[in-house]
Every structure is written in structure tokens, then in C-alpha cells.
Amino acid sequence: MCRYILFTLLTIVTFSVSFSQSDHVAIKWNEQVLEAIRNDYARPTVHARNLMHSSAIMYDCWAAYDTTSSEHYFLGNTIGSFTSVFDFENFEPNIPSNSLEKMKAQEVSMSYGVYRLIKHRYMSSPQWSSTLLNINAQMASQGLDTLIVSTD
């Protein structure tokens, strides 16, 4: 009986956590990257790099708005021969103080970052039109304009 109760509790906790996490924008964009991979040629090395870059983009977009974050991957760093210039001092005053507004800003930032990555990396994919429809629909579901190309 005790095992049954323990199993039931663990199942409930597991599913409640997985359902609540599936609504996060990072999960949704990761699914878009995986779908773009399915719509492309089999190129494991390229796709591994794209997954890493999408994760780094989402992390940096989150970390830019999180004042307790001590490290960034691209922002303000040099990776190989590429330097990403980022002015933390001028950016920090623009971070919303309200936690809900900050979370929304992080989600918007992540969305534009991964949207642009997918557009750039998969435009020569054999099923590019399907991928473009998917990512445009994702942006529309968040109320974001795909025509904005600002780097601010």
C-alpha cells in the first residue's frame, strides 16, 4: 500500500512539473529548433552546433535581464575570433524592476534571438517554407512582430 501511494505521489509530481514547464518560451523555441532540424538534411554536426547556439542565445537573453547572473556566453565576450560587444552599464537601467515585466522581456528577447537564428541557419533547408510558417506562427502566438530587425 505504501509503495502504491509513493508511486502515485511521484507520478503526480512528475506530471505536474512537466506540464507547467512545457509552457515556458524556451521549451517552445527548443521545439521549433528540433522541428527545423527534422525539416532539414541529415547534418548531425551542423544541427548539434545549431542546438548549442540556440541554447546559448536563450541563456544570454535570460542572463542579460538577471542581475544576479555572473556570466554570459556571447554577450560581452570573445569566442574564437568573434567579439560580441554588449554595454552592460547602459543596459542595466533598462531592466524592468517588476518580476513579471522582466520575465516578459526575457521571453521576448529569447524569441527574437532564436527566431533570427532559425531564419538564418535553415533558409536553405528543403522544407524551409514549413519551418518559416512554424516560426512565424510561434512569434504570432506571442504577439511579436517578425518585421522588427533592431539589435537594441
For each feature predicted by the language model, list its residue ranges.
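Acidic/polar surface patches and capping/hinge elements
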Residues: 21-152
